[in-house]
Each structure stands twice: as structure tokens, then as C-alpha cells.
Amino acid sequence: VVLSFMREGFLALNAKTGKEIFFERFRSPINASVNAASPLVIDNQVLLSSCYEVGAGFWAYKESSAGKGSFDAIWKKKNALDCHYSTPVQRDGFAYGFHGRQERGPVLRCISLKDGKVMWEAPAIGAGNLLRAKGRLIVLTEDGELIVADASPDRFRVLHRQQILGAGSRAHFALSNARLFARDQRRLVCLRLDQFE
């Protein structure tokens, strides 16, 4: 199955034939909006999140005897996790992502994938991107601040905080062999993350 989060909604195609097997409208009534966060696939389930009064939805894929398959909504909530640009990450049944519009100062949130319940919101850290590695959330804010925190549904606990870039750090960063690669509008940096374990 090929999944795509299109401007109009959630599309699933048969990988062999290219034929549509599922579509559900999942978009804002605001025409100027986009669905920018990528689908978060977890086994046979998928989490979608969008801003502009859309929210999040969690679906489960079920294979049919005819090979067509279908997606059944587990839950959909308007105010659970409204990701504007950044794709959320998951760990042990919980998703972590930036909730709210980028220009209005989103908050980092943890939600339960079981029912979309909000577990916590982090103090205002602004917009950014995040990855998950070894039970940690690795966050790079648009202001160039690196935050390493526990990926735990209990609370937001910062383990390390450091200014590594200037403002305008909107590009997604990469992690490889315990090294973080990130850039702002003027430079590229590489940091060893194993020093924060």
C-alpha cells in the first residue's frame, strides 16, 4: 500500500496496480491551507495531522480477502495534535509533535495514540522540527536551539539545551551514527549526540 497525504486528504493506493483503495477528505475549509506533515506509519496504522482547524486522525489498515484492503478510523479529533509543517514522531503508543500554527507559536505536545488524549504540553519553545532516537526527543527550534528531552508520556523533561544555530532554522535536520546535522540560513553544523546520553 502506498500512502499519501494530499492537499484534499488521505489517499491510499495499491502498490502493484496504482489503483485507489481508500480516500478520505481530511483538510481545512480554508482554501489557502496545505497538508504539510507526512503520514506517520506505525505497523498497520497511520497518524495524520494538519493545522487550520483540521486536527489529527488515526486509522488502522485491514486487508480484505479480495486484496483491496480498507482503513478504519480509530479516532479523529480537531484539537489533539494540529501539526503545521513538522511531522510528529512516536514511541510506545504515544505521538509527539508541534501543535498549532508556526507563525502563532506552537507548543510541543504528547498525545496518546489510543484515543488522541493530550498527555502534556511543553513550555513555550516556539516552532521547530523533531526526531526520536534511543528514547529521546531531539528538537531543533526555528530559533536554532537544540533540546534533548525524554520521550515519555508522563511529562516533558529536558536533558540538554544548547543554542547551536541562528534564527531561521526551518530546514529539517538529520541524525546518523550519533551525529546531528543541522543548518540555518548561513551555516551547517555537525554535533555528536552521544555526549548527551
Regions found by a protein language model. Give the residues of each.
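Noncatalytic, solvent-exposed loop/strand surfaces
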Residues: 1-197
